[in-house]
Amino acid sequence: MVHIFTLSKTVYNTTLSKMNERPDIDIPGDYESIRSETLQFLEKASKNFSNLNSEELYQMKIKFIRGGTIKSFPIWNLLNGPIADAIYHTGQIVSFRRTTGNPIDSSVNVFMGSYR
């Protein structure tokens, strides 16, 4: 869960043109806070992206700082980087829940983000 948290934070920080510090030291200590903040980051990032025009989106960069070294990458790297990685790990969580007898409620519509 912490890894998905940091991935969602990276996506959100990118929408603010904010630096992503590695390693991330600002991580909540309990499951509920991690889950809640992860969902909030994704919701806020979605809203921020929908307010951008194509030129603003094109100019946006993902920025990282690690040990004093700064690196930046095109916004498109969010797709094959943090977003793809978060989807992959979410699938792992779903699989683990099934194998331990705790599957996700079948009335959940993942595509719509709602219950049927």
Question: What are the language-model segments listed below?
Answer:
Residues 1-24, 65-116:
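Short, contiguous alpha-helical
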Residues 29-66, 70-95:
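Acidic/histidine-rich alpha-helical segments that form the ligand environment
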